[in-house]
Swiss-Prot record:
Keywords: 4Fe-4S, Iron, Iron-sulfur, Lyase, Metal-binding, Nucleotide-binding, S-adenosyl-L-methionine, tRNA processing. This is S-adenosyl-L-methionine-dependent tRNA 4-demethylwyosine synthase TYW1. Residues 259-286 have a biased composition (Basic and acidic residues). Disulfide bonds: none annotated. Gene3D superfamilies: 3.40.50.360, Aldolase class I. Residues 248-312 are annotated as: Disordered. FMN binds at residues 85-89, 176-208. Belongs to the TYW1 family. The lineage of its organism: Eukaryota, Metazoa, Chordata, Craniata, Vertebrata.
């Protein structure tokens, strides 16, 4: 064999590999790439299987041996509830709302505006991610409550101060619920509206429209202020849940008319029911924000507001003013239609609403009232209890001879047209200027009033100190004091109620607050008719009585004039409040000449303890000597009158017309049997046989006269002095 041939045969494969080396390299590269891809796929699948097998809460990232938790977006960090309260209602609502917010696992803080400094802390809410809720009440004359006074003052000044600007609170989120009474129509929920407006002017974002609670059960959208708040609270919690999830949508561009647009028509079910249609207007904001419902203010509105903020040509001013007037007319028409509908005062079943709400029933029951039907009540006077024990009667016993243990204190109307600062009923009674509630029949009211009164008397059976004969007498009602609470003359069937009293041989003592002159003129004869004369000037009357009527002074004077034509016994009741109405002697004298009452009761105000609804303190209570001095000075100005009686225990004196002083003796007491005979003759003659106060007067005993050693205390009874004096909780 040829050696050269063998060499070629051995080198041929190597030469072939060399020649095809490119393809070999390519094959190796492809193989390695495939291997790498397979490894990546295997590892990825294994990781996915591992993640599925581990709970989601434990899927943390490991970095250099440390656990790094995934951060979650927080859209709402908490809720701050600010309240401004006078009687405690707003504070109670704040507590209820806080409980609802807590159920969402959100931190919540309740803050009294009296203890909050907006100058230092309000700006913090811009970046805090909190939702701020303001529960604010409207108090006298549309002003804020004492606790919210400084906050509102600061907020108003900041809203109009150019140094703060329109973006000062940009980023702050808020909601407002106002508490008010639509009976005060001119400033209903004014504070809530203002707080809402001022926050918006400073750039804060409203998360939902303003809620409005109404104490007037007739006009309240849901039947009571508590129900109004519950409805608003439900919507707020729903809105808060949406904010927690970070749900967002484009806000309205602000060009919609009357606050209506397609986006909000779809969500109309969520629109706040507590605000009026004329208060629904969307403010321009081009940013992407949380879902919200907006309400408008009368001062700002849509395109008009935008155009007024920019430069306006003089010739365009006329068009703008015409447009503003047109909007105002449309608003008034909507308010009128809304008012006509709301004045019907019907509940969901179409029935006329009752005056007594569940919350009012609870409050009055705690105060010892026995409620009757839907608008009446009866309560046992402390003087009734006193006379059952033989410890003396009230000043009516001293002045007019009533038997205090046989006197039933009641009212057919818990509602009143005033909010007197010295009212000892704790300002829980409803207010109104006319009857708009469901009405009970007088027969039922009288029947249940007597039954409830007798049941309260029965509780004293066997009580130590109670005299058996007086207990038996007390079971038969002989007198009715229509002075418990409210304005009894508002009750549409008051005349029928009085006739029923007289048919039962029960004398009638009716007290009115001098705001219903027509009703006084149309009133049937009563045993004794009182008019409360709490002040002698327009300003002081407004300050003390806080009346609902705008023309309260004219009504007051007309009521006194109506009293002058009454033939039966009439009385002015003056309540002296030191530093408020004790320096108006000449004005009081003029009022006396206007009504020519038979008697004038002058009584020092009774301090009934601290009340958030009144600024009255012990410093306003005059000493008995001061009351005596006032009466002496007043008598000097009214020559036809003299001081007749005194009841030192009640801090009260009686001024009587001289016609009741016969033969040097006073005849201020009442012959009750004679009155019943006269009223029966009056009824039998259909009112033609009239009678006067002198026809049923009786001689006043010596111990009741002014200057007597007894100082008005009946010597038949035993004077009792408590070891620990406590505040009076009720009285005539």
């Amino acid at each position: 064999m040829d050696p050269s041939m063998d060499t070629w045969d051995l080198s041929s494969p190597l030469i072939s590999l060399w020649i095809n080396r490119f393809y070999i390299y390519l094959g190796f590269a492809v193989s390695i790439s495939l291997w790498i891809c397979v490894q990546i796929v295997i590892k990825t699948q294994g990781r996915n299987l591992q993640e599925k097998s581990v709970p989601k809460a434990a899927q943390d990232l490991m970095t250099n041996g440390y656990v790094s938790l995934q951060e979650k977006d927080v859209f709402v960090s908490g809720v701050k509830i600010f309240y401004g309260s006078q009687t405690g209602t707003a504070k109670g609502f704040a507590t209820v709302l806080a409980e609802a917010v807590t159920s969402l696992d959100l931190p919540v803080a309740i803050i009294n505006l009296k203890e909050y400094d907006p100058d230092d802390h309000l700006i913090e809410e811009v970046t805090s991610k909190n939702v701020c809720v303001f529960l604010v009440a409207t108090y006298t004359d549309g002003l804020p409550t004492e606790s919210a006074e400084w906050f509102c003052k600061w907020l108003e000044e900041a809203a109009i101060d150019f140094r703060f600007g329109k973006t000062y609170l940009k980023g702050m989120r808020y909601a407002v619920f106002g508490l008010g009474n639509s009976a005060y129509a001119s400033h209903f929920n004014k504070v809530g509206k203002n707080v809402d407006k001022w926050l918006w002017m400073l750039g804060a974002h409203r998360v939902m429209s303003r809620g409005e609670g109404d104490c007037d059960v007739v006009k309240s959208k849901h039947g009571s202020i508590e129900a109004d708040f519950r409805a608003w609270k439900t919507k707020f919690i729903s809105q808060l849940q949406a904010l927690q999830k970070g749900e967002r949508k484009k806000s309205c561009g602000g060009h919609c008319k009357k606050g209506k647009c397609e986006s909000h028509q779809r969500g109309s079910e969520e629109r706040e029911e507590g605000s009026h249609e004329q208060d629904e207007l969307h403010h321009r904001d081009t940013e992407e924000e949380e879902p919200f419902e907006s309400s408008s203010e009368e001062e700002f509105g849509g395109k008009d507001h935008q155009s007024l903020n920019s430069i306006v040509d003089v010739e365009d001013l006329g068009k703008i003013m015409d447009h503003v007037k047109k909007e105002k007319r449309e608003k008034e028409q909507r308010e009128e239609k809304s008012g006509l509908f709301r004045n019907m005062g019907r509940n969901e079943d179409g029935e006329i609403r009752a005056m007594i709400t569940p919350a009012l029933r609870e409050a009055l029951t705690k105060q010892g009232y026995q409620l009757i039907g839907s608008h009446s009540g009866v309560k046992l006077c402390r003087w009734t209890k006193s006379m059952l024990r033989g410890r003396g009667g009230c000043y009516k016993h001293t002045f007019y001879g009533i038997e205090s243990h046989r006197c039933m204190e009641t009212t057919p109307s818990l509602a009143c047209a005033n909010k007197c600062v010295f009212c000892w009923r704790h300002h829980t009674n409803p207010v109104g200027t006319e009857w708009r509630w469901k009405m009970d029949q007088p027969e039922m009211i009288l029947k249940e009033a007597i039954e409830n009164h007798q049941n309260m008397i029965k509780q004293f059976k066997g009580v130590p100190g109670v005299k058996a004969e007086r207990f038996e007498e007390g079971m038969t009602v002989k007198h009715c004091a229509l002075s418990l609470v409210g304005e009894p003359i508002m009750y549409p069937e008051i005349n029928r109620f009085l006739k029923l009293l007289h048919q039962c041989k029960i004398s009638s003592f009716l007290v009115t607050n001098a705001q219903f002159p027509a009703e006084i003129r149309n009133l049937e004869p009563v045993t004794q008719l009182y008019v409360s004369v709490d002040a002698s000037t327009k300003d002081s009357l407004k300050k003390i009585d806080r009346p609902l009527f705008k023309d309260f002074w004219r009504r007051f004077l007309d009521s006194l004039k109506a009293l002058a034509v009454k033939q039966q016994r009439t009385v002015y009741r003056l309540t002296l409040v030191k530093a408020w109405n004790v320096d108006e002697l000449q004005a009081y004298a003029q009022l006396v000449s206007l009504g020519n009452p038979d008697f004038i009761e002058v009584k020092g105000v009774t301090y009934c303890g601290e009340s958030s609804a009144s600024s009255l303190t012990m410093a306003h209570v005059p000493w008995h000597e001061e009351v005596v001095q006032f009466v002496c000075e007043l008598v000097d100005l009214i020559p036809d009158y003299e001081i007749a009686c005194e009841h030192e225990h009640s801090n009260c004196l009686l001024i009587a017309h001289k016609k009741f002083k016969i033969g040097g003796e006073w005849w201020t007491w009442i012959d009750y049997n004679r009155f019943q005979e006269l009223i029966q003759e009056y009824e039998d003659s259909s009112g033609s046989k009239t009678f006067s106060a002198k026809d049923y007067m009786a001689r006043t005993p010596h111990w009741a006269l002014f200057g007597a050693n007894e100082r008005g205390f009946d010597p038949k009874d035993t004077r009792h002095q408590r070891k620990n004096k406590s505040k009076a909780i009720s009285g005539c």
